UniProtKB/Swiss-Prot annotation:
GO cellular component: cytosol
Catalytic activity: acetate + ATP + CoA = acetyl-CoA + AMP + diphosphate
Binding site for ATP: G394, E395, P396, D418, T419, W420, W421, Q422, T423, D512, R527, R538
Gene behind this protein: acsA
Keywords attached to this entry: Acetylation, ATP-binding, Ligase, Magnesium, Metal-binding, Nucleotide-binding
Identification of the protein by name: Acetyl-coenzyme A synthetase
Modified how: Acetylated. Deacetylation by the SIR2-homolog deacetylase activates the enzyme.
HAMAP family: Ac_CoA_synth
One Gene Ontology term of the molecular function aspect: metal ion binding
InterPro entries, per the entry: Ac_CoA_lig, ACAS_N, AMP-bd_C, AMP-bd_C_sf, AMP-binding_CS, AMP-dep_synth/lig_dom, ANL_N_sf
Positions with a binding annotation for CoA: R198, K199, D200, A201, T318, S535
GO biological process, one term: acetyl-CoA biosynthetic process from acetate
Organism: Thermosynechococcus vestitus (strain NIES-2133 / IAM M-273 / BP-1)
N6-acetyllysine: residues bearing it: K621
Keyword Transcription (UniProt): no
Amino acid sequence: MSHPTIESILQENRLFYPPDDFVAKARIHSLEAYNALYEKAKADPAAFWGELAQQELEWFQPWEQVLDWQPPNAKWFVNGKINITYNCLDRHLKTWRKNKAALIWEGEPGDSRTLTYAQLHREVCQFANVLKQLGVKKGDRVGIYMPMIPEAAIAMLACARIGAPHSVVFGGFSAEALRDRLIDAQAKLVVTADGGWRKDAIVPLKDQVDKALAHQGVPSVENVLVVQRTQQPVTMVPGRDHWWHDLQKGVSADCPAEPMDSEDLLFILYTSGSTGKPKGVVHTTAGYNLYTHITTQWVFDLQDTDVYWCTADVGWITGHSYIVYGPLSNGATTLMYEGAPRPSNPGCFWDVIEKYGVTIFYTAPTAIRAFIKMGEHLPRARDLSSLRLLGTVGEPINPEAWMWYYRVIGGERCPIVDTWWQTETGGHMITSLPGALPMKPGSASKPFPGILADVVDLEGNPVGVNEGGYLVIRHPWPGMMRTVYGDPDRFRRTYWEHIPPRDGQYFYFAGDGARRDEDGYFWVMGRVDDVINVSGHRLGTMEIESALVSHPAVAEAAVVGKPDEVKGEEIVAFVILEGSATPSDALQQELKQHVVNEIGALARPAEIRFTDALPKTRSGKIMRRLLRSLAAGQEVVGDTSTLEDRSVLDRLRQGS
């Protein structure tokens, strides 16, 4: 009996090796070393993770059992006692890192600040004491709705220090979206700012908090702490609202880290599904600490001299894991930038790299596509010679965008780590280890040691080499989410019941289509929800989009299916052109034929729609379900709280 899978139709055969001088200094410096680590972890996962936990982290009390697995519920480092901020801060004060830069911050208007590990520790302890004075106790949830300023990281670390789980809400979310998340988390206190800078404009954060809390909208919230960032006037509600700087003044910097059970709740982070209520992803303390620590160290090949910059916002999991917790646990210097490329300074990212001598640069494919559109002249006008490693995160990267990144930003000398992971996984799952594995443009490479990734059909049968299927993980890992906050049934249904268990083995269902090639490299083909069924052939959107973007006139493309009586679905492509290209019927035909030449007639788009923008979430992901509705001429329904620019939908409707 055959079971539906996803057809793979795009071939990419280019191969790139890390430079010899990079390999010579790398922590994991050969394919043989990677294979040995991977096989060691596969043979005895508990021993592998237990050994790393002992070597890499400091514990208040040792664990009794590495893993207690009662599918789908995992407990890691059972009955161990630990505090993530002790590992991120206190232990470094006993070494030369005490006076090392922990956090470099660059504000959009050009102001800046650097905090050493000693200074960051002091500010975290002071703010932890402020929280205690306001009645926040171990187990109380704290909402954080902040711009990208040091106080955002300080607030997260202060919460973790006293055992108060934080729930960071991205500062671009509306008051309604903020209210929903604060209600679900039953937050006792909210930390915010008067405003933040983004693209030369002030984002009025405190006003949004006031709207969210209006008319007892979130009855659990007792206090609001406000950082002065932009200095614009805001309403301060007596008895509820307090200025951060007033309460921080003169507060003791003595606040011992609370011993936390390994499985104590560390944070809740909300991720939107295509429709319905956002899911509160739960991460706990010890497993998350270890997993973000070791993935940061190995994937970015961290060295003591690195200046590491992840361009994400702390409101997303990438900011949690790879701006705050992972780098600081390793004693690294992590850079935080408040703004984004904007008309007044489109080359601001390259200015930051040049100014601080950034050595590791980690950004999203959507940003890389924007850089391509802005032109090579911007990065070429800056000195980017400090860079030694590049990374991508958030979605699969088209091979041509990968090549541009490698050539223009990395100067063909910086390895690229293309990292596949999710809010739910806590950290990197499939990724290159830069000194060990050759790179294939567009491939996430191989599973991280300890991650048993596979590609299967809907019955759990492994599919063949280069056959598309469903990406699954066959064994628990320390960084995995523990549940959906307050909804364990949703956790089980969403992640563990799509594919039935086989021989007692459960499958974590990632929701992505993928294939594995003859070298064991994984190629992520996009969300399963985005698969298009054309005449019985199930095609992933990613490969068709990659073919379109490989045309010199195309800056970005998004592909969706549109219902068709004969074929089931037909392919509709929304295309943003490069600056010099102009829309025309001739170009439409040329692009359709280009896809045929690259992939085959099966993938020929029925329609090419030119546009100047695509509907994206505030983290830069294309909202294809909205495009599906537009392509089909239907009304857009469902949750649009994550949509960054609502005017894009109106422009797309007018152009259809």
